[in-house]
Amino acid sequence: MIELQSPANGETVSILTDIQKDFIRNRSFEKLRANDEELVDWLGLKQNMEGENSAPLPVEFKWTSDDKSRLNFVLQIATDRSFEHPVRRILARKQEASVFNLENGRQYFWRVFIEDTPPDDAEVRSFTTAMDIPRWIFIDGCTNVRDCGCWMTASGRRIKQGLLYRGSEFNRHHAVTPAGRYALVHDLHLKTDIDIRGKTEIHDGFVPPLDENGIKWVNITVEPYGEIDKPIWRKQYREYFTFLSNPDIYPAYCHCWGGADRTGTTSFLLGALLGMSDEDLILDYELTSCAIYGARKRNFKLFNDMLNVLDRYPGGSFAEKGTAYLKDIGVEDKTLDAIRSIFL
C-alpha cells in the first residue's frame, strides 16, 4: 500500500526561495528614476557563484510504501483528476521526488504507483502552485532563467506563461547539462532558441547548442540600453519584434550572455508593449540581481540612458512610451497586435 504524504491535499505550494521573496518584498517604488550614475560593464560580465539565487524551489513529493519488494515507483502529475493530461511521469527508487518547472497558479493532481502495475486504485491528491511572480525556471548549467509571463497588465489581463523564457546562454560561459537539455525539451517543450548575441560571440564553425535536440536556432543581434536609438539597432529591434509576432515559434527562449542587459532590454520593451506597470518593469529588470552577474539597478547610468530615449516619446507610462518607440522604429500596428494576441 502506498500512502501519499506531501504536498498535502489542497495545499498551495510556493516555488520562491526566502531570498527571492525578501528581494521582492524589500523593493521600494517611491522613486522609479534614480539620479546616480553607477556603471555596469555588460560586455565584461564577472561571475559570482555565491550570488546565485535565481534557481526556484522544486515541489517536493513524499510518500510511504509497505511494499519492500519492488524497486521503482511511478510519480504521475496531471492537470486533471482523470490523468488524461499528464505533465510529468517520473521513475523513483526512493519514496520521494523533487519536481521543478511546474506552471504557477495551476492546480495539479498526483498519484504514485508501482511500475508495471495499473494505477487505477492509486490514491489521488491535488495541490496548487502559487501565482508567484516571477516564475523562475531551473535549467541545470544556466542562470537567471525565468518565464516572461505571469505579470499582470494595465488591461487587467495576465501575460501568458509557457511562451517566452529568458535567461543565460547555453554555451561559452555556460554549459547546459544533459539534465538542463531534458528540462528544455520535456518541461518547457522549447521550439526556438532566440540568440541575440553579437557575431564576435558566435565563433566560426558554431553549432547551435540545442541543434541535436531539434530546437531551431535564430540569431538576431541587438545591443542594449541607449543603443536602441541608433539606426543599426532600431533595425534589429524591428526584426526582433517582427519575429515575436509569429505564433509558430513558441515556446521560445531568448538569451544573450547572462540574460541581463540585452535580454533585459528586449524584455523591458516587450513588457511595455503588453502593458506592464512601471513598477513591474523596473522590478523585472532588477530581478537579475538574484543571478550570478551582480546587481542590476534602476540607478545604472546605462539603464537610465534607455529610459531617456523612451522619454522622448509621448505617454505617461513606460508602457505607452515603449509602444510608441516600437511604432517609430517601424514595427507595424498589425505586428504589435499579433504579439499582444499571442501573450494576452
Residue ranges with predicted function:
Residues 1-253, 265-344:
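Cys-dependent protein tyrosine phosphatase-like superfamily
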Residues 258, 262-263:
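Ser/Thr-glycine-rich phosphate-binding loops at phosphate-binding pockets of nucleotides
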